[in-house]
From Swiss-Prot:
Subunit structure: Tetramer of two alpha and two beta chains.
Protein keywords: Acetylation, Amino-acid biosynthesis, Aromatic amino acid biosynthesis, Chloroplast, Lyase, Plastid, Pyridoxal phosphate, Transit peptide, Tryptophan biosynthesis
Record GO biological process: L-tryptophan biosynthetic process
CDD domains from the UniProt entry: Trp-synth_B
Name of the gene encoding the protein in the UniProt record: TSB2
Name of the protein this chain belongs to: Tryptophan synthase beta chain 2, chloroplastic
DNA damage found in the keyword field: no
Membership in a protein family: Belongs to the TrpB family.
One MF term in the entry's GO annotations: tryptophan synthase activity
Protein source organism: Arabidopsis thaliana
Chain spans, region Disordered: 1-44
Xref: Gene3D superfamilies: 3.40.50.1100
GO CC field: chloroplast envelope; chloroplast stroma
Catalytic activity: (1S,2R)-1-C-(indol-3-yl)glycerol 3-phosphate + L-serine = D-glyceraldehyde 3-phosphate + L-tryptophan + H2O
Length: 475
């Protein structure tokens, strides 16, 4: 049963400062904000900053290196600092128009930590409307599939987020942000979507709470996910196709931000991933942290311990961070994120941001990005619309750099094979996003000791992807 304590965890931090919305590659132009000597001892209301221009973030020793040099545990720095940064990643690179809205959002977010009515309402909705808690399911036949000839092998468990209302993890964040928007008095909701699951979740909660809903979706993704487009419209949402750029998730996000800048007084932006400007990466993570909290509780009930390995797909990274966050300080628990390698890492047609990207700024935050030598965004590719994004959440970038999490990639072909394999072994059709994580088991399981317990976040169901799979699979 979901409780207020498992529904969300809030960690106070002060407002971050910066002022660029568009993508930046030239580090010499990035402002570096430094607290005045006594700032950390002051209240947030009296917080001050001084501003200098950094020559290059690469010249400034990364926070992870400082921590290691000092002999400290780098995971203790995993929470964002007073500027919304995870090490050198994150921050708030937005136009002045949005600064007040983001500060207002952050203040409201923290106030919910002590708001018993909000926590109670959220817990009840997660339980009775979303259907939490989601099961931690022992995948018996998948486990048998990975047994070696000597009978040894890992034990595979699936965290069944596909059983949530709307069929994916996205509803956790959408319902919490909708409640938050009501507290802010915002009647108009906008969101971006790639695979359509976040769009469906947002349209669902807007119908539930009587809010106006506008969804931005790339025209290419609308073709790939026609079923979800119909579902959103059936729920009363206006779906606006985005034809600019690559007509995928990146461009949908850009259009949503433009809308927000124009209508900031009346509109709340339900960003769907742990990306974007502070406080979104922290806020979305905390609303999804219920996944990891339940996993810890369920693991203790099932075998009296923790998982040995956590596995999740990574596009923007919300489902992975929802699972990982609870276990970040448990350094004996491996955390593995799986990106989309598309046609292959050397093909130039992939979405493996953490594997092949460089540091830059996109959609309001500094993180790893797919970009060329001139700092222009490279068009990503994945058969999965939900992983087809050229950036990643800043906390994932931080966890990669400090070595706390591992990140690998899986091709379209490998994901399709896993889509078919798991459907036939377990009778569960996975989303193509989830199929990337499932595909990595082929490489991971042979390396694990006998009896190692692997928890894979089954982030969504595959009904939406059947039309795509028909084009490539023989069944």
């Amino acid at each position: 049963m979901a409780t207020a304590s498992t529904a969300a965890t809030f960690r106070p931090s002060s407002v971050s400062a910066s002022s660029e919305l568009t993508h930046l590659r030239s580090p010499s132009k990035l402002p570096k904000f430094t607290p005045l000597p006594s700032a950390r001892s002051r209240s947030s209301s009296s917080f001050s900053v001084s501003c200098t221009i950094a020559k290059d973030p690469a010249v400034v020793m990364a926070d992870s290196e400082k921590i290691k040099a000092a002999g400290s545990d780098p995971t203790m720095w995993q929470r964002p600092d007073s500027f919304g940064r995870f090490g050198k990643f994150g921050g708030k690179y937005v136009p002045e128009t949005l600064m007040h809205a983001l500060s207002e959002l952050e203040t409201a977010f923290y106030s919910l930590a002590t708001d018993e009515d909000f926590q109670r309402e959220l817990a009840e909705i997660l339980k009775d409307y979303v259907g939490r808690e989601s099961p931690l399911y022992f995948a018996e036949r998948l486990t048998e599939h990975y047994r070696r000839e000597n009978g040894e092998g890992p034990l595979i468990y699936l965290k069944r987020e596909d059983l949530n209302h709307t069929g994916a993890h996205k509803i956790n964040n959408a319902v919490a942000q909708a409640l938050l928007a009501k507290r802010l008095g915002k009647k108009r909701i906008i969101a971006e979507t790639g695979a359509g699951q976040h769009g469906v979740a947002t349209a669902t909660v807007c119908a539930r709470f009587g809010l106006q809903c506008i969804i931005y979706m790339g025209a290419q993704d609308m073709e790939r996910q026609a079923l979800n487009v119909f579902r959103m419209r059936l729920l009363g949402a206006e779906v606006r196709g985005v034809h600019s750029g690559t007509a995928t998730l990146k461009d949908a996000t850009s259009e949503a931000i433009r809308d927000w800048v124009t209508n900031v007084e009346t509109t709340h932006y339900i960003l769907g991933s742990v990306a974007g400007p502070h406080p979104y990466p922290m806020m979305v993570r905390d609303f999804h942290a219920v996944i990891g909290k339940e996993t810890r509780k369920q693991a203790m009930e099932k075998w009296g311990g923790k998982p040995d390995v956590l596995v999740a797909c990574v596009g923007g990274g919300s489902n992975a961070m929802g699972l990982f966050h609870e276990f970040v300080d448990d350094t004996e628990v491996r955390m593995i994120g799986v990106e989309a390698a598309g046609f292959g890492l050397d093909s130039g047609k992939h979405a493996a941001t953490l594997t092949k990207g460089d540091v830059g700024v996109l959609h309001g935050a500094m993180s790893y990005l797919l970009q060329d030598d001139d700092g222009q965004i490279i068009e990503p590719h994945s058969i999965s619309a939900g992983l087809d994004y050229p950036g990643v959440g800043p906390e994932h970038s931080f966890l990669k750099d400090v070595g706390r999490a591992e990140y690998f990639s899986v091709t379209d072909e490998e994901a399709l094979e896993a889509f078919k394999r798991v459907s036939r072994l377990e009778g569960i059709i996975p989303a193509l996003e989830t199929s990337h994580a499932l595909a990595h088991l082929e490489k991971l399981c042979p390396t694990l000791p006998d009896g190692a317990r692997v928890v894979l976040n089954f982030s969504g169901r595959g009904d939406k992807d059947v039309q795509t799979a028909i084009k490539y699979l023989e069944v």
